[in-house]
Amino acid sequence: MPRSLKKGPFIDLHLLQKVEKAVKTNDKKPIRTWSRRSTIFPQMIGLTIAVHNGRQHIPIFVADEMVGHKLGEFAPTRTYRGHTADKKAKKY
C-alpha cells in the first residue's frame, strides 16, 4: 500500500544529514546506514550507500532509476539456497 501523497516521502533525519554533508564535501566514501525504510532522494544519485541487511552492510550505488524506491529493496535479507535433493536415489 503506497504512502499518502499529502505526507510525502520519508527519510531518516540522520541519513539526510549524512547525504547532504557528503554532497557538500564531494565525499565518495560509502555512507553506512541501518535505515532500510528511507526513500531514495534525488540528492543521493551518484553516492554509494551501505545498507544493513541484518548481517552485513551491502554497498549500493544509487542510480537515477532508483529514486522513489526504498533503500531496503536493494539489500535482500533472506538467502535462498534451493530445495534439497532426495538423499536416496530413485530407481525406475
From Swiss-Prot:
Residues forming coiled coils: none
GO biological process: ribosomal small subunit assembly; translation
Pfam family name, one: Ribosomal_S19
Record-level GO cellular component terms: cytoplasm; small ribosomal subunit
InterPro entries from the UniProt entry: Ribosomal_uS19 (IPR002222), Ribosomal_uS19_bac-type (IPR005732), Ribosomal_uS19_CS (IPR020934), Ribosomal_uS19_SF (IPR023575)
GO molecular function: rRNA binding; structural constituent of ribosome
Keywords: Ribonucleoprotein, Ribosomal protein, RNA-binding, rRNA-binding
Annotated PROSITE patterns: RIBOSOMAL_S19
Function comment: Protein S19 forms a complex with S13 that binds strongly to the 16S ribosomal RNA.
Sequence similarity: Belongs to the universal ribosomal protein uS19 family.
HAMAP family xref list: Ribosomal_uS19
Protein name (database record): Small ribosomal subunit protein uS19
Organism: Baumannia cicadellinicola subsp. Homalodisca coagulata
Gene (name only): rpsS
